[in-house]
């Protein structure tokens, strides 16, 4: 130690004391690990020797540099580079709950990536990669990985069978007793990336068995929706349960997300930061090209708006909301919405479930000032459904007080009221958090639909399942029995289901060629099951009141034209044909058929007032209808009480437009009606300037 001057003890490692020292030759601060050899076991001495051996092989700006080792006072002394910025774990802890910018995350991540690539190139496994072993320079800009005490140099005859490392970062294959390999380091890399994005560990538990269970099932909360889909997907790929599905380091570095950060790293590290005055940019006079997306909104012109449009908007009306109310958003794009009796739910492009709820009593927004006479506008708060373990939601459906969602892996989860067995868990128990419908785990599901108290689900192999309340034959099982577990539904020969729809007490299927089959209550011929020619009315004994199994529609023209969209209301239904025509059938008590007459006909009728307008989507509430045009026009008709039509009108027997508070062109992406409520999602469509 004559070449060094001890300054202070900075830590106590697994095998010894860590000193901060001054190297006398150049007055440089260094770290010296003092490892007492005499008290060490053979394995511990091997680990200490191994660290020296590994550090000698490595030479990289993002790996702690090795200087020398020597014996003194019956202890092995290892001199290495000092990183004054502390550990990455300390850096994360000091952030509290203030999330890092994505650019900062990637700046750190690609340096760790380069370091690990250098290590693997020398056929070395780190085996203990964690934020506590990742160090920072004094500016906290340069990352250096260290602590190679339990690294393993691979030879053709050795396999790293020992289970080592910090438990929170151990991969699933290690939990199973399989050999440690490079993909295990990549799992740990994913844990570090997750920690950078979430400021917390991906896997934590009160005890080791619970931790192993979490790791083995790959259950971790999704990272914030503020980050790009590419970053979120990178986390998921690194934390794949199957080692073979984790990308190799070269593939990670080749991803556009990382290439940009790597380029910035090589051009910016060591540069001197300078302030730069931003010059004002004169508005461009170039014209704009027409986008291929059909949209509604302000007229297009060469001047682009100063304020960028939101990614998407979700509107709600009905239930006392007389006009469309834009719901609060969490800086995300909602691609699909679903309305229930009380629920308002949506799915974001990044695969998170967003819910809109009334604020708690006393939270403001719902009280009147003394002397006020007007009713306050109802307020809603938005929140992401928490507690989901790294799952990506791609579709949501709502019933009466319960919700079903479908993940990108084809798994259905349900939560809410368990009455009538509509959660599919084999009981009537209420469940507050989304829970997997275990009976369907052997199938990859592609769609789920909810009625008031029953559910239909469709698999990739076009297998159909139903559960919940069964009266009127709504489950299509040939009986009126209820079921609390999914039951496979028999399909008529030659029919292949493509889409499922549920109503209050009935169900419908769209088949691959565009035909429709229905079961359940056919009151008022709301399912179109009466066998009718155009303009014909059935005699009473020919009227079909209910069907216990899925049956082809028999009322013209529904049995003749391919159908694109269909929805079921309480006492009526609506369908859009391949040619863009909208037909309604069932009860017209409140004008919900759009014929400007309250006639009591059981025959389907073409909606009046939409001539020349091609329709694309339709949704039915309890006594009203909402239709969306191919150009994203929004129309409603039927009962107007409590804001059902999205305007101040009373009942309207003919379609009238619904005005949305949009200042930018938009396209409607999803619509859902339930009882007296409507949810509608729109996506902003911006025109890109024509390149010069």
From Swiss-Prot:
Residues 277-301 are annotated as: Disordered. Changing residue 45 to W: In PKD8; pathogenic; fails to rescue defective PKD2 targeting to cilia in NEK8-deficient epithelial renal cells; decreased autophosphorylation. Changing residue 416 to S: In RHPD2; uncertain significance. It is found in: Cytoplasm; Cytoplasm, Cytoskeleton; Cell projection, Cilium; Cytoplasm, Cytoskeleton, Microtubule organizing center, Centrosome. Its main location: cytoplasm. The keyword Magnesium applies. Changing residue 87 to A: In RHPD2; likely pathogenic; contrary to the wild type, it fails to rescue body curvature defects in zebrafish morphants; decreased localization to cilia; decreased interaction with ANKS6. Residues 282-293 have a biased composition (Polar residues). GO terms for molecular function: ATP binding; metal ion binding; protein serine kinase activity; protein serine/threonine kinase activity. Changing residue 602 to W: In RHPD2; likely pathogenic; contrary to the wild type, it fails to rescue body curvature defects in zebrafish morphants; loss of ciliary localization; no effect on interaction with ANKS6. It holds the Pfam family Pkinase. It catalyses: L-seryl-[protein] + ATP = O-phospho-L-seryl-[protein] + ADP + H(+); L-threonyl-[protein] + ATP = O-phospho-L-threonyl-[protein] + ADP + H(+). Signal peptide: none annotated. GO terms for cellular component: centrosome; ciliary base; ciliary inversin compartment; cilium; cytoplasm. Residues 4-258 form the Protein kinase domain. Its cofactor is Mg(2+). It is linked to Nephronophthisis 9: An autosomal recessive disorder resulting in end-stage renal disease. It is a progressive tubulo-interstitial kidney disorder histologically characterized by modifications of the tubules with thickening of the basement membrane, interstitial fibrosis and, in the advanced stages, medullary cysts. Renal-hepatic-pancreatic dysplasia 2: A form of renal-hepatic-pancreatic dysplasia, a disease characterized by cystic malformations of the kidneys, liver, and pancreas. The pathological findings consist of multicystic dysplastic kidneys, dilated and dysgenetic bile ducts, a dysplastic pancreas with dilated ducts, cysts, fibrosis and inflammatory infiltrates. Required for renal tubular integrity. May regulate local cytoskeletal structure in kidney tubule epithelial cells. May regulate ciliary biogenesis through targeting of proteins to the cilia. Plays a role in organogenesis, and is involved in the regulation of the Hippo signaling pathway. This is Serine/threonine-protein kinase Nek8.
């Amino acid at each position: 130690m004559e070449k060094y001057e001890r300054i202070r003890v900075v830590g106590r490692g697994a095998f010894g004391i860590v000193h901060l020292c001054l190297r006398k030759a150049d007055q440089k601060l260094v770290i010296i690990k003092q490892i007492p050899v005499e008290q060490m076991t053979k394995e511990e001495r091997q680990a200490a020797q191994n660290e020296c051996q590994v550090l000698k092989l490595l030479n990289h700006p993002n790996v702690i540099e090795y200087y020398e080792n020597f014996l003194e006072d019956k202890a092995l002394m290892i001199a290495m580079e000092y990183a004054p910025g502390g550990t990455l774990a300390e850096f994360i802890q000091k952030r509290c709950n203030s999330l890092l910018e994505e650019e900062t995350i990637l700046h750190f991540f690609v340096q760790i990536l380069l370091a690990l690539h250098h290590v693997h190139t020398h056929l070395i496994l780190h085996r203990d990669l964690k934020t506590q072993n990742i160090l920072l320079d004094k500016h906290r800009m340069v990352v250096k990985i260290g602590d190679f005490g339990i690294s393993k140099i691979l030879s053709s005859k050795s396999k790293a069978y020992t289970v080592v490392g910090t438990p929170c970062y151990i991969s699933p294959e290690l939990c199973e007793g399989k050999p440690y390999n490079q993909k295990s380091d990549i799992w740990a890399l994913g844990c570090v990336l997750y920690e950078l994005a979430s400021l917390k560990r991906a896997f934590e538990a009160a005890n080791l068995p619970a931790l192993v269970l979490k790791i083995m099932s790959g259950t971790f909360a999704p990272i914030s929706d503020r980050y790009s889909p590419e970053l979120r997907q990178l986390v998921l790929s690194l934390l794949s349960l199957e080692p073979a599905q984790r990308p190799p380091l070269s593939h990670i570095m080749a991803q556009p997300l990382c290439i940009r950060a790597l380029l910035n790293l090589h051009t910016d590290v060591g540069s001197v930061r300078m302030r730069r005055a931003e010059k004002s940019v004169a508005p461009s006079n170039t014209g704009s090209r027409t986008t291929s997306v059909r949209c509604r909104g302000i007229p297009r012109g060469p001047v682009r708006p100063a304020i960028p449009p939101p990614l998407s908007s979700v509107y709600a009306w009905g239930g006392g909301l007389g006009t469309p109310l834009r719901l609060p958003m969490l800086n995300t794009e909602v691609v699909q919405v679903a309305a229930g009796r009380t629920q308002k739910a949506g799915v974001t492009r990044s695969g998170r479930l967003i819910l809109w709820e009334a604020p708690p009593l006393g939270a403001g927004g719902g009280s009147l000032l003394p002397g006020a006479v007007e009713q306050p506008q109802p307020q809603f708060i938005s929140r992401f459904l928490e507690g989901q373990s790294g799952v990506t939601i791609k579709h949501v459906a709502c019933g009466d007080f319960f919700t079903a969602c479908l993940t990108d892996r084809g798994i259905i989860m349900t939560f809410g009221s368990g009455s009538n067995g509509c959660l599919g868990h084999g009981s009537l128990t209420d469940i507050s958090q989304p829970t997997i419908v275990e009976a369907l785990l052997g199938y990859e599901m592609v769609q789920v639909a909810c009625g008031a108290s029953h559910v239909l689900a469709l698999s990739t192999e076009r297998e159909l399942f139903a559960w919940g309340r069964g009266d009127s034959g709504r489950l299509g099982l040939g009986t009126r029995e209820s079921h609390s577990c999914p039951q496979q539904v028999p399909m008529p020969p030659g029919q292949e289901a493509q889409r499922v729809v549920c109503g209050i007490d009935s169900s419908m299927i769209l088949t691959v060629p565009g035909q429709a089959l229905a079961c359940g209550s056919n009151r008022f011929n709301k399912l179109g099951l009466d066998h009718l020619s155009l303009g014909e009315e059935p005699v009473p004994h020919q009227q079909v009141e209910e069907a216990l199994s899925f049956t082809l529609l028999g009322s013209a023209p529904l049995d003749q034209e391919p159908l694109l969209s269909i929805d079921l209301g309480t006492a009526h239904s609506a369908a859009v044909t391949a040619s863009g025509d909208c037909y309604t059938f069932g009860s017209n008590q409140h004008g919900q058929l759009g014929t400007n007459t309250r006639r009591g006909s059981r025959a389907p009728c073409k909606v009046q007032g939409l001539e020349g307008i091609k329709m694309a989507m339709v949704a039915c509430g309890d006594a009203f209808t909402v239709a969306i045009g191919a150009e994203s026009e929004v129309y409603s008709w039927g009962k107007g009480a409590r804001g059902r039509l999205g305007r101040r009108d009373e009942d309207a027997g003919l379609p009238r437009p619904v005005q949305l508070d949009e200042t930018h062109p938009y396209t409607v992406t999803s619509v859902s009606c339930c009882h007296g409520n409507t949810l509608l999602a729109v996506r902003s469509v911006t025109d890109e300037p024509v390149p010069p």
